[in-house]
Amino acid sequence: MGFNIERADKPFVVKSPYKPSGDQPQAIAELAERIENGENDVVLMGATGTGKTATTAWLIEKLQRPTLIIEPNKTLAAQLCAEFRELMPDNAVSYFVSYYDYYQPEAYIPQTDTYIEKDSNINDDVERLRHQATANLLTRRDCVVVATVSCIYGLGTPEEYAGRMLFLKVGQEINRDDLLRQFVAMQYKRNDIAFTRGTFRVRGDTVEIIPVYEELAVRIEFFGDEIDRISTLHPLTGDEIDEENEVHIFPASHYVAGPERMERALKTIREELEERLAELRKQGKELEAQRLNMRTTYDLEMLTQVGVCSGVENYSRHFDGRAAGTPPHTLLDFFPDDFLLVIDESHVTVPQIGAMYEGDASRKRTLVEHGFRLPSAMDNRPLKWPEFLQRVGQTVYLSATPGDYEMGLSDGVVEQIIRPTGLLDPKIDVRPVKGQIDDLLAEIKARVAKNERALVTTLTKKMAEDLTDYLLERGIKVEYLHSDVDTLRRVELLRMLREGKIDVIVGINLLREGLDLPEVSLVAILDADKEGFLRSYRSLIQTIGRAARNVSGTVIMYADETTEAMRQAIDETDRRRAKQIAYNQEHGIDPKPLIKKISDVNDMLAKEDVDTQTLLEGGYRNAGKAGNTHLGVPVLDPNEADKRHEEILKAGLPAQDLADLIRQLSEQMHTAAEQLQFELAARLRDEIRDLKKELRQMTEANK
């Protein structure tokens, strides 16, 4: 789609110390060949731990096409985005997920006459990353966007968003006041005191703005009515970072509407209101008509006076100028026509994309019927499955267990089952249910003796709790993982398992996709012959995969009979294992254990604290705040702290301010981590590192 913006055409380049190995080269070549030959749907069936992420990156490098990757949840999306940023540091890797930390949609329950107002909490950093994704898509071709199902929900029109974009160049003739009016029309706010994202400030002939998708501010210096200089600067310190010749500034909102659009929207909303009121009164729904009239009239007044109202997205059809029933504009419309779609964990993600529309529609239908919303609110919705398919081109489905839908579309799958480390799929042992607990206890003890770990999956919470108690009584270090355990506690338990503080985790359905634990050598599946969702072929394959990252990985299924799902899972695992053994023998490869660093956010905080206090006070007293006292280093000479303080004083006021700023940001970093805002914590860490580098240079210069 062209928006009169020339996209920078930089090549995709993967920077990795590794080369494609195992059957990665064959998978990359086959996928690329099929896509270049015009196949629309291709399935990559990649066993756990075979490097599907790296294969995808190398495929993008080979095809040189902008790519959208859809993940089933925010956690996996964040994980994949971080991996892609490491693999493609010079390309635009963006993150596009729902920006709500908390979201309670507007709803009405007729049975109890209960109206629930919309309530939400927006995460500013995720919102910035969403804006960064759309800005990148319109200005560059080397884009990879990692998204969740959020990408099929309504977004403003790309034409209007690009049309309101401002292009500024050194030497350009533009009146300063006209520029300020344009910023306001783009929904930026003037604030000469608190300079934050989405605001601008004016100081004589100098205008500074922080675009919503950037962390750096842009300074525009005028000489009369001509732009004399453009530069980027650090918004906190005011230090200039780079001089620019030209800059694009996109609107502060995806839902930006010019005066003509606003005028037209207000007119069509009034017309729809009149029609709907007549309809409701004809049906004898006087209460509903009165309610609708009152709510919509208030919204119209707000739109006229302020340009925005609560729930403005429900009028998106009027602002976009769409006909009733037509699909909304989404992130997909921001991509060039030749983009590639990758659906990760497709057995989960495909049904998820298909299910979004109906859930949204049933809630809105009730609101419309009872006079809380105009019928046009139904058109502020996610895409239906057929509409989604119309907007995407060639698609790669990634999964260890592809679903029936994608298997039916594709003409044979591309397999990737050889691991670069030579690791094999685990051996599977089926044992009788009688005496299963004592047998399991003996197996766990054997693993503990070898400093290995075990996962046990049961069918019910009750059984998981009872088994955990039984193992605890027998002296096993065990924890129980279930749906009530919050995210941070879950991460902590898995970390404790890897460190050996616990030897066994008992769970129900939480031991499947995306769990990467190289220390686990035993996965025990209790009641494997009870047919159902938790013991289906795909669930079993995903659970078996948790033991595939250890050289001596074994799976024990406790069952009295072999179900069809079990037989399929065992046959598939044996087939893969035979192929892996043959490959290893042919190439003389010995399976190597997967070495994966145990790291978490607490480590990151503690290390940063060590460095900060060593810099500011010449020593490090207590790492307790970060929860890792073992990372503390002894305080140096008692006079060292005074000496360091004197050095900072000698370097002058900027150095003192910098030291104070580092302390403040360190506190903010801890707060962000405590509130699970890990992206913000990591960003603050990077900022602290830059400031510390600057402070070191200042103190060195004054020695």
Curated annotation (Swiss-Prot):
Chain ranges of the Helicase C-terminal domain: 436-589
CC per GO annotation: cytoplasm; excinuclease repair complex
Localization (cell): Cytoplasm
Subunit relationships: Forms a heterotetramer with UvrA during the search for lesions. Interacts with UvrC in an incision complex.
PANTHER family assigned: UVRABC SYSTEM PROTEIN B (PTHR24029:SF0)
Family membership: Belongs to the UvrB family.
Protein known as: UvrABC system protein B
